[in-house]
UniProtKB/Swiss-Prot annotation:
A Pfam family the protein falls into: GreA_GreB_N
PROSITE patterns, per database record: GREAB_1, GREAB_2
Protein name per UniProt: Transcription elongation factor GreA
Keyword terms, alphabetized: DNA-binding, Transcription, Transcription regulation
Family: Belongs to the GreA/GreB family.
GO MF, one annotated term: DNA binding
GO-annotated biological processes: DNA-templated transcription elongation; regulation of DNA-templated transcription elongation
InterPro entries registered for this protein in UniProt: GreA/GreB_C_sf, TF_GreA/GreB_CS, Tscrpt_elong_fac_GreA, Tscrpt_elong_fac_GreA/B, Tscrpt_elong_fac_GreA/B_C, Tscrpt_elong_fac_GreA/B_fam, Tscrpt_elong_fac_GreA/B_N, Tscrpt_elong_fac_GreA/B_N_sf
Source organism: Hyphomonas neptunium (strain ATCC 15444)
Function text: Necessary for efficient RNA polymerase transcription elongation past template-encoded arresting sites. The arresting sites in DNA have the property of trapping a certain fraction of elongating RNA polymerases that pass through, resulting in locked ternary complexes. Cleavage of the nascent transcript by cleavage factors such as GreA or GreB allows the resumption of elongation from the new 3'terminus. GreA releases sequences of 2 to 3 nucleotides.
């Protein structure tokens, strides 16, 4: 069973989503199915079929979340440190050509959100940065060609 690395924040978010699905969404869809059933003939009951489809989606997501939480390897980023880039690090990098700076936090796959500056540990940028230190350069393969980045700052918070 492969472990899934995630921050405490990411773990809490998955638990919160699971709680909502089990305590709010599941009972709501069961009530909707019951209501649709009361309308008679199920073979031509679009409301019933839509509710059953939604139930299938919700049950699938619950199963997926249960599995991810069971395999979670929760990493407390506040207890990490050092100068090397690892999971949980907040890294400031600069494009070697343009000198544009960007800051990313390296997180688990389910937590990744580029708009919030969070990238997956399995992303090309994160894979290129892992193990680097401040001042090191990392080359990232991109669709438009390879880009070189310099590690400016590594922080664990």
């Amino acid at each position: 069973m492969e472990r899934i690395p995630m921050t405490a924040e990411g773990h809490a978010a998955l638990q919160a989503e699971l709680k909502v699905l089990k305590s709010v969404e599941r009972p709501s869809i069961i009530a909707a199915i019951s209501e649709a059933r009361s309308h008679g003939d199920l073979s031509e009951n679009a409301e019933y079929h839509a509710a059953k489809e939604k139930q299938s989606f919700i049950e699938g997501r619950i199963s997926e979340l249960d599995d991810k939480l069971a395999r979670a390897d929760v990493i407390d980023v506040s207890k990490l440190g050092g100068s090397k880039v690892r999971f949980g690090a907040t890294v400031t990098i600069a494009d070697v050509d343009t000198e544009d700076e960007q800051t990313y936090k390296i997180v688990g796959e389910d937590e990744a959100d580029v708009k919030q500056g969070k990238i997956s540990v399995t992303s090309p940028i994160a894979r290129a940065l892992i193990g680097k230190e401040e001042g090191d350069e990392a080359e990232v393969a991109a669709p438009a060609g390879a880009r070189a980045y310099e590690v400016i700052k590594v922080v664990y918070k």
